[in-house]
Swiss-Prot record:
It comes from Rickettsia peacockii (strain Rustic). InterPro entries: 6-blade_b-propeller_TolB-like, PD40, Tol-Pal_TolB, TolB_N. Belongs to the TolB family. The Tol-Pal system is composed of five core proteins: the inner membrane proteins TolA, TolQ and TolR, the periplasmic protein TolB and the outer membrane protein Pal. They form a network linking the inner and outer membranes and the peptidoglycan layer. One of its GO terms (biological process) is protein import. It comes from the Bacteria. Part of the Tol-Pal system, which plays a role in outer membrane invagination during cell division and is important for maintaining outer membrane integrity. This is Tol-Pal system protein TolB. It is found in: Periplasm. The gene is tolB. GO terms for cellular component: periplasmic space.
Amino acid sequence: MRNIIYFILSLLFSVTSYALETINIEHGRADPTPIAVNKFDADNSAADVLGHDMVKVISNDLKLSGLFRPISAASFIEEKTGIEYKPLFAAWRQINASLLVNGEVTKLESGKFQISFILWDTLLEKQLVGEILEVPKNLWRRAAHKIADKIYEKITGDAGYFDTKIVYVSESSSLPKIKRIALMDYDGANNKYLTNGKSLVLTPRFARSADKIFYVSYATKRRVLVYEKDLKTGKESVVGDFPGISFAPRFSPDGRKAVMSIAKNGSTHIYEIDLATKRLHKLTDGFGINTSPSYSPDGKKIVYNSDRNGVPQLYIMNSDGSDVQRISFGGGSYAAPSWSPRGDYIAFTKITKGDGGKTFNIGIMKACPQDDKNSERIITSGYLVESPCWSPNGRVIMFAKGWPSSAKAPGKNKIFAIDLTGHNEREIMTPADASDPEWSGVLN
């Protein structure tokens, strides 16, 4: 059987074209591509259960992206499953499935599972992509995410983002409020708490490798510590005691340095720390509040916000603090800039005032404002929307969204995701209130 699988998959790489047009997810909203994720064939009951669960995760990943429309299995006409046969394409076209995913799960003598899949174009009747994965049972969800990533990449031309993690601050709804650092899959599954709730914690950040996080903890009202936590071993260590720090550091692409804002003598400035020597280097000067620094993907520039001209605006400087340029020119106050991993856009929070009071907005602008000073675009607004962060492919933004208390319901805070086009806004389910999300890179 394995030889047959390898033979079939070897045919994939001779395919150079297919009927579907590549989806461009920057050009506004497009109709989702209909896709059928067929039942995965299995060699025993354990593999059958695993395959059933994987189909649900793959379908959900593709649906959440907003670019695919999984077709209900109740509509399927063809009854054959697995990857060892050529599909009856006319039957899939009859239910308007442009794409078809067939798969197979086999339990190996080692106890691991071999998972194989093929993505078909039903219009040209050709294979597009396929792969064989070998995973222990406890990693079956990651295998499903990886398959969805492969499908997403083949059809959009961009890397997928499903095999990723989110770290965030979880807050209990009952009094006294308990804040804990929590970790979950990008879709809200596998939620677990990383801190015990005994101290106030804020702004968790992933290290570049995604196997460590850093966060701010208030040991006392006056003592603020930055902690490093190894997600593989669970061990914690103190990076430093930084009086006046308000946000956890953000890390350079090479992982050797980090930037943070620290308040001293009535002013708040941006500092860079060498993680090996723990030496601090001040990057901004003058009076005012300079905060929320974020590196560009190549590490050569830093975006941050500053009220040096009276109202918080966004600025870019070289990573050594030179060549400062203002990049925001609209009305309102700007905060929390986050540079896209692709380097093309910067996301931000913007606060505007009107007759109804303050409105919070999440927006994006081009990272090279000299090319277009009118590139700013608001993609969502609300009573409280803040803390934007990017998917590793730079095509989705995750953020925190809050609602005020009312006579009928208490206030709440949740995590949402939205495409950079401003479409497909959806909630990421968490067991309690949630804020300060941070998106990992694709896992190894």
